[in-house]
């Protein structure tokens, strides 16, 4: 499957509003990579306090968006069924860098690539862009909880 809409996404990861931070998956290569979209709207609950004068998406939520994309890639790579109960947790975040702010109206393109899988620990390279401009990059590690 190369495309997943929000209904499909909810069948494979446990996140729900206000912490479901992926709107669509546009490309999946099992065991390799995934590309997803997050449409950032002014109605996001975090904009109320971050920041009222100039709304900016918190960097930790950009990282979380990448982690959710990685979670979908894991589930699809392992051929887990819809409604599975497995949950993958952060094991680490390395080399996180933020290069541009993400504001209401932006569309985040989230790309994750598998770097390594060892003993159930998955390591990914993640990149979030807006209009082909790098917003965030990081290495993410996850493990089944």
UniProtKB/Swiss-Prot annotation:
Keyword Transcription regulation: no
Keywords annotated in UniProt: Cytoplasm, Lipid A biosynthesis, Lipid biosynthesis, Lipid metabolism, Lyase
Compartmental location: Cytoplasm
E.C. number: 4.2.1.59
Any GO CC annotation of this UniProt entry: membrane
InterPro entries named among the record's database cross-references: FabA_FabZ (IPR013114), FabZ (IPR010084), HotDog_dom_sf (IPR029069)
GO BP terms in the entry: fatty acid biosynthetic process; lipid A biosynthetic process
Primary location recorded for the protein, binned into one broad class: cytoplasm
GO molecular function: (3R)-hydroxyacyl-[acyl-carrier-protein] dehydratase activity
Described purpose of this protein according to its UniProt entry: Involved in unsaturated fatty acids biosynthesis. Catalyzes the dehydration of short chain beta-hydroxyacyl-ACPs and long chain saturated and unsaturated beta-hydroxyacyl-ACPs.
Family: Belongs to the thioester dehydratase family. FabZ subfamily.
Protein name, per record: 3-hydroxyacyl-[acyl-carrier-protein] dehydratase FabZ
PANTHER family xrefs: 3-HYDROXYACYL-[ACYL-CARRIER-PROTEIN] DEHYDRATASE
Substrates-to-products reaction catalysed: a (3R)-hydroxyacyl-[ACP] = a (2E)-enoyl-[ACP] + H2O
Gene3D superfamilies: Hotdog Thioesterase (3.10.129.10)
Catalytic residues (positions): 50
NCBIfam families: fabZ, PRK00006.1
Species in which this protein is naturally found: Coxiella burnetii (strain RSA 493 / Nine Mile phase I)
